[in-house]
């Protein structure tokens, strides 16, 4: 095709949501922000916060605060939340959803309470500590309530129950986001319970069909997406970007790339 669609391609979250918002007329419900996180020699991602497990650091684009202020008249704001290890070639995806009506900021973990290999929940505790102690205040949401993955899903989450092949965490996170957008007043736990009532094979089938649906939508809009991706990887990448780090001591540093 004209675009490189991959189920774990992070920029396709924003590309797909722009299509969804336009087609379903959700412009008053969802805010599509426009900021980037750039760090290292060649890493850039749109509308995201990242957690570096190796360094115990939370990476926040400086432009995030300004973009959130533009979204105060919308119900939902999404933030892709990436979990990275320096010694691994790939990471893991969560989804952050800000609900401006209920004054909440939730983090959805498709594995369940925490990463399936985070047996002692050390990663969960570190991330939640950074959210509660620093992040909410820094991004101007100190009066919001943080909803941890343990408050949304049982220990065994949707992705783990389905046992889908590695890399589908982006798609599971995006599916949860779409279900929240389309069912704004349904409790988060009920959305997860609805999916977990299904058998392993049913969940597996749902996520693969959903991934195919996203792929088809992206290919239908390939011309626009080529322009968006070119903007991200050429013009935007050349600009110097600042990002804020909440370090392992939960102190704030500012980094420039």
Where are these regions (language model features)?
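Short, flexible coil/linker elements and helix-boundary hinge sites characteristic
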Residues: 24-28, 39, 48, 52, ...
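Cysteine protease-like catalytic core of ubiquitin/ubiquitin-like
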Residues: 71-182
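C-terminal folded domains that constitute the principal catalytic or ligand-binding module
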Residues: 142-243
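Generic detector of well-ordered alpha-helical segments enriched in charged/polar residues
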Residues: 11-21, 65-69, 136, 189-193, ...
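Cysteine protease catalytic domains with a Cys-His-Asp triad
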Residues: 1-95, 100-105
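Short amphipathic alpha-helical segments that mediate assembly, nucleic-acid/protein binding
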Residues: 10-13, 61-64, 120, 132, ...
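Intrinsic-disorder/low-complexity loop/linker signature
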Residues: 25, 56, 103, 121-122, ...
């Amino acid at each position: 095709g004209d675009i490189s669609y991959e189920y774990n391609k992070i920029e396709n979250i924003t590309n797909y949501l722009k299509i969804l918002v336009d087609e379903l007329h959700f412009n008053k419900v969802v805010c599509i922000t426009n900021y980037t996180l750039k760090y290292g020699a060649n890493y850039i991602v749109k509308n995201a916060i990242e957690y570096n497990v190796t360094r115990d650091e939370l990476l926040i684009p400086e432009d995030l605060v300004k973009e959130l202020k533009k979204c105060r008249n919308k119900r939902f704001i999404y933030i892709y939340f990436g979990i990275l290890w320096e010694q691994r070639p790939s990471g893991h995806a969560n989804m952050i959803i800000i609900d401006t009506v209920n004054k909440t900021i939730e983090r959805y973990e498709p594995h369940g309470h925490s990463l399936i290999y985070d047996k002692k929940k050390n990663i969960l505790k570190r991330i939640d500590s950074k959210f509660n102690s620093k992040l909410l205040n820094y991004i101007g949401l100190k009066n919001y309530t943080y909803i941890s993955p343990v408050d949304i899903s049982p220990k065994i989450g949707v992705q783990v129950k389905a046992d889908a092949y590695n890399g589908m965490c982006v798609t599971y996170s995006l599916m949860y986001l779409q279900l929240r957008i389309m069912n704004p007043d349904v409790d988060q736990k009920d959305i997860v319970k609805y999916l977990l009532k299904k058998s392993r094979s049913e969940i597996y089938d749902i996520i693969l069909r959903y991934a195919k649906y996203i792929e088809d939508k992206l290919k239908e809009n390939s011309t626009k997406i080529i322009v968006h991706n070119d903007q991200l990887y050429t013009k935007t990448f050349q600009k110097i970007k600042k990002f804020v780090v909440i370090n392992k001591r939960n102190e704030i540093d500012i980094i420039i790339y």
